[in-house]
Amino acid sequence: MMGQQTKVLKQFDNNGDGRLDASERKPAREFLQKERAAGGGRRGFGPREGPGGPGGRGGTKQEAPKPGAKLGPTDVKSFPDAPLYDTKTLRTFFLEFESQDWEKELADFHNTDVEVPVKLTVDGKTYLDVGVHYRGMSSYMAVGEGSKRSLNLALDFAHKDQNIGGYRTLNMLNAHEDPTYLRPLLFLDIAREYLPAAKANFARVVINGESWGIYDNVQQFNKDFVKEWFGTTQGARWKVRGNPGGQGRLTYLGDDPAAYKGIYTIKTKDDPKVWASFIKLCKVLNETPADKLEQALDPLLDIDGALRFIALDNALINNDGYWIRTSDYSIYQDVKGRFHVLPGDVNETFVKPGGPGFGGGGRGGGPGGFGPPMMLAPQMMSQGDKDADQKLTKAEFSALADVWFDKLDADKAGKLNQEQFTEKFADILPAPEGFGPPGGGRGFGPGRFVGPGFFATVDTDKDGSLTRSELKGAFEKWSSDWDSQKSGSLNEEMLRTGLSAALPPPNFGGPGGRGGQGGGRGPRGPGGATMPQVKGVELDPLVAANDPNKPLISKLLAVPALRARYLGYVREIADKWLDWKKLGPVAERYHALIANDVKADTRKLDSTDDFEKGLTQDIQGSGMGPFGGGSMGLKQFADQRRAYLLNYSEVKK
């Protein structure tokens, strides 16, 4: 998820109808392009440009994207009587954009308040003026033009009652970081046994007559969702957007709603009374003694649901979850005033711990992962490529070192320590929307967590200071070492690959540790020392039990009865749902349903070989998980995680 949108709709909506037609979108695009070219946009660093996807996670190399098969409504089977999210159905969605330039148009309007209209045909029925935008953050920025990006479809964009099977918003997800496509479906299947969670199945998407292959079709958290689970469309909803430096901790920040509004995005009416009740929840959670917490909190929070929520996150290792990032989840306050904490994006599940917010994984993050290489490589290319040929020569790379050092050494002292370097590095690697804290300031931008590792790498004499000659020497050495083709220059992929090997994992740090007396240290949140590694899938079920920055875990698990109940849920999930005898047949059925389409998919982010292996074999890379350039087989994860949890001393009780 991205942060606050860039608002341009009102500025270019000349006829005041609340949306932009083609004639209005043209100047809006030109405006955004100029803003971003001048550095006035809000994206900081953008997606990969040009043809080609992220290159996979270190398994079989992804082929360059190319046009898919031509398909029309008469070429596929219709399912007019099947529910929209029927998991046995592979339904086809035909999108017709007004322009063949639709990819660039969606990219121009990414993270703005503008929808691009399409004609949508499903099961032989046509829906007009459906609004479409690219969704996601890492799943967008790590994917180049021509490869599959996630889509959000608003059926009610222009016609308020328009829906498919009672659903007004669709999310077509690109299976970023998941070569199997199965992870969201499996996680949500299990989650719905414990708490309100989205429905999901697979969809075949055809755009302007060309197949774009298989997407995960995941239900939107909106009024339709609330109606299904709670029997009403009333109540308040919040989205805690995905952010590697997530601040959606449910900590008490005082009584002023302004302190919360930059973190928790309210999706319903911005009512002061609603905010007051939310702030009360945070205050009670954080400031009530453990022996009084359950009684005080029960009227405000579905405590049992919260325990199930954190148990699912941990047992199934959700690398986008509250336990690691304190973001990318949803909150609902029902009509009785009680709050419910619900899952958000779950594509990075059934994996080894890693990714933004964690110290595990590979070195600097796989070339296609959302890590320092993906952040740095586009900036290096855009800032150093003076002749605009999409390559960096050794001379250009060396000149870039001079430009960077001039910016970093503002005081002209001739050298920088790590603190000075990191502080100024934010000017070289600006924060995109969603990274900075509310109220401005650099805060937790990419420069903050990439800077220390970058400094350590280019400080070649390891004396704790960086000189111009050291920076130039490092860049010139990289230019030679990473030029695998001996062409005299580096393209962006070479930069990413080289940076992935050269840089250490980012430092997120912070208070942490497992719970219990004498417990060892666990993964840490933003703000402190480097986090320890976790062996394989051995993520402690009591991780963050002593972390004050994760009160939904630490405060609830400080109550012995709640701790025991939580561990009971962990035990049940491991014993029942991670048993491959139960999980395997479901995964195999899903795999078989989409296998032929995935093989034929010319826009997918991973190879067919990785798709086939991912069910029962590890896909090897420089490491495992989103930052490590590999992917763990689903069966391997289930077997190993189940064995570890069922043998964990407090889970066995």
Which residues are covered by each model-predicted region?
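Acidic carboxylate motifs that coordinate Ca2+ or other divalent cations, activating on Asp/Glu
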Residues: 13-17, 21, 320, 385-391, ...
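Phosphate/dinucleotide-binding and metal-coordinating scaffold of catalytic cores
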Residues: 1-8, 26-383, 393-395, 399-407, ...
